Each structure stands twice: as structure tokens, then as C-alpha cells.
Amino acid sequence: LESGMLQLKLDWCDLEDVVSGALRRSKEHTQSYKIKVEIADDLPLIYADAALLEHVVLNLLDNAVKYSVEGSEIEIQTCLDDSEVIVMVKDLGLGVTAKDLPHLFDKFYRARQTEKISGTGLGLAICKGIVDAHRGRIWAKQRTGGGSIFAFALPVTLPEEKAGEKND
């Protein structure tokens, strides 16, 4: 990722399939949580690396589980907003302090309140690298009423070299 040499295996993919794949892979860890999934009906196919996006969703979901009370609700939502598709993972866990928010996607950064929870501090940095490679953006924010929201957005517009192929 750091060298900028990440090779994306781009193809048309459905975000519903990406989310479903992440849910299947996390089933063992999420079975004691109430997982709520809302996939927007109007999502277009996107030109992306589905396996890497599944890794991003899986990491965000695993973090939600790691920082939430067993049995609590975790939501995964997708939506279309102008020229972006957005995937959000919402939890009712520990939440994120305003002080930690700007650093969450830095390599090796661990929020203070999470010192007793295992992790390397690389997961969110890797997610950021994957999303950046797709010309997207990733962020986190505090959730009203407690917990946090981690989200990423990807453009639905085609890379210039693919625009002609779709019209053929």
C-alpha cells in the first residue's frame, strides 16, 4: 500500500454482494450480535476490486464487534448520494473521542480507551489505503446517543479508460 503499488483487480461489482461476503466471513464473530443490514435499492454496479472492498467492510464490521457489548445492534447501510455509493457500519459501542477522530486511520494509532482490546493499529490504515486506491474517501464520526459510525464512499463514475467500454 505504501509504495502505491497495490494492484486492483477491477471489475463490475455489486455492493450487496460485497456486504454479503463480509457477513459470511464474519459469521462466527457476529452471531451473538444483532446485525441489521439495509441495502439501498438504487445502487448501481461499481467498477472496483470486490475482494478488497469486502476486506474493508469486514474490518469495519470486526471493529464494531470488538468495541461493542455482546448482543448489541450493529447496522450496515448502503446508499447512493449524488455520484457516490456509501457504505456505513454503525455500532453502539465505546464510541470515538473527538481527540481520536483525526488519527484513527493513521498507521499504528490506537485510541486510548482501547488499550485493553487486541489489535495492531493497522486495520483502519489498510482500509484507508484500499479506499484511497479506489479514489474514494473514508471517515469516522461519533454516533448520536453513543457508539460510532465508520463509513466509506466510492465514486460511481468510471475511470476515463473504462467509460468507452461500458457504452460499447
Question: Where are the regions a protein language model picked out?
Answer:
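Short conserved segment of the HATPase_c
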Residues: V96-F108
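Conserved catalytic submotifs in the C-terminal HATPase_c
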Residues: K9-C13, K34-P44
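Short alpha-helical Gxxx[C/S/T] motif in the catalytic ATP-binding
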Residues: G123, C127
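A conserved beta-strand-to-alpha-helix junction within the catalytic ATP-binding
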Residues: K9-R24
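Conserved micro-motifs of the catalytic ATP-binding
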Residues: S3-L8, L45-A48
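Short helix-loop "hinge" at the ATP-lid/N-box region of the Bergerat-fold HATPase_c
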Residues: A64-V65
